[in-house]
Amino acid sequence: MVKTNILSNHFLVAMPQLNDFTFTKAVIYVSQHDAKGALGIIINRPLALTLGKVLEHLNIEIAQPQIANHPVLMGGPIGQEHGFIVYEQESPQGAEILLSASKDMLDDIAKNKGPDDFLITLGYAGWEAGQLENEIARNDWLVVPFNRKILFETPLKSRWQKAAALIGVDINQLSGQIGHA
């Protein structure tokens, strides 16, 4: 059994045999993991929606025209009517990755006063107590240490392969028929 909280600030990389439409080839940033369950955001599933359309819908004026084309991601199957901003913030302990649902932060981003690096998502992935640990034991997920470049700089289409490569795995070489030793 995986200790609780150990998966916070890690990536989950879907194994090739995971055939659930939502999670096929998904990379998830785990924001929170404790005895009650886990919460994560899929970071490589773009929607047919841009930040410009979201800001227009919210009547927020864009001061930075180039952010209008920033992709909006499907963060997960739960609460897809809710948006999240995934961003980095410096703290006395170092850089932290935070989630926000603040309209004020969206306004700051539109005015070029927000974080330099951010993701905009709709929805999230959630697991009840013990559910994620069982999925990991079933070989549904690789657990990969957090890497800021994967989260903010790697092209969306490359994140699945690049995240697995962080732990020396060529995900394309894995069989969909993985068993237990």
Curated annotation (Swiss-Prot):
Coiled coil: none
Membership in a protein family: Belongs to the UPF0301 (AlgH) family.
InterPro entries named among the record's database cross-references: AlgH-like
Transmembrane segments: none
One family name in Pfam for this protein: DUF179
Protein name: UPF0301 protein CBUD_2193
Superkingdom assignment: Bacteria
Cellular component GO terms held in the UniProt record: cytosol
Organism in which the protein naturally occurs: Coxiella burnetii (strain Dugway 5J108-111)
Upper lineage: Bacteria, Pseudomonadati, Pseudomonadota, Gammaproteobacteria, Legionellales
